[in-house]
Amino acid sequence: MPRKNKKLPRHLLVIRTSAMGDVAMLPHALRALKEAYPEVKVTVATKSLFHPFFEGLDVGFLDIETRRTHRGIRGAIRFAREAAELKIDAVADMHNVLRSKMVRAALHLRGIPVSVIHKGRIEKYMRLGRGSEGVKPLKHTVIRYCDVFRRLGFDFPDPRPAEKRPRPNPMGEKRGVWIGFAPFSAQPGKTYPEKLSAEAVRLLSGRFDRVFVHSGGGEEAEFAR
């Protein structure tokens, strides 16, 4: 529930450093917030790689370098100090992982209120193996982001879906059934093994008309070819 009888934050730190798809959904929630509260200053803590996702939004950035400057416990404390220097007065943790927990804990000790995303892991776990019968749709991540803001006292409607604009398909005319396969991750533990990925692509190719392997550059792009 939103906080009652509390002044709304004037400068909000929003934390989401990965994964790319989750960061890409954040601007939809921010746009809904800014439409209702244009006077609220927002600083997004993320990787510089993801800045283009927020084009057209009136937000600032606090870049986080998870592999260098802000690595480990000391890095998290350093990042919290940098955030505090911006005079933020609330934190919206849209990630809720070990690093963001350390950052928000350090800021909370400074008296800065925090709000954290509820990822719905129990609901997702309960759905496994049940099929589709009698199962209600899970709450969309964008709505979960909005709820984080609402728990800080903001009150605004859910974002409106963007209007679809016709664009030419760079992959050509769609014929048959296409499927995408994304075996890679920024974290090694979440990356599907190469041999199993190759076997998965082989099996998918026998069942679908086109298989798209989503990858980054370097070795990932080489595998995708």
Spans of features found by a protein language model:
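Catalytic machinery of carbohydrate-active enzymes
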Residues: M1-R225
